[in-house]
Amino acid sequence: VLAEMVRQEFAALFDDDRSRLVVDVPHNVVLTEEGVNVHRKGATPAHAGQFALIPGSMGDSSYVVRGRGQEDWLRSCSRGGGRRMPRQEVRRLAPADGQGQDWQCVTLREERRIEEAPQAYKPIGPVIEAQTEAGLIEGVARLRPWTTFKA
């Protein structure tokens, strides 16, 4: 929804803007599909041929994938690797001065940067592999982060 709002604002500002929303990443949402409500918590739609974004952490790759529409999995895929440790534990363990970090984050609230440190998340690679092997997705592109914006 936010990406679409940004796209609309750009279209209003720039006469020659031809951008269009390519990938949206709802991951805690209820959507009506085929007459029923599908609740996805930590998952995102992966309908056959539909693009999805599976984000890694600030220190790990993210992936653009194409859904395979597996009905047994409610035409869904995982939204990411998941947290390895709770936010309060990361705040306790991470150096407050950012020493030794090889990632970049722009944020309004410093505690959010620390809470989202790469070590707080599980690696995304095995998640992508498992979903590919299960026939839920096919990889399209691997994206390496260079900076992250965190509200």
Outline where the language-model segments fall.
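Domain-length cofactor-binding catalytic modules of enzymes
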Residues: 1-151
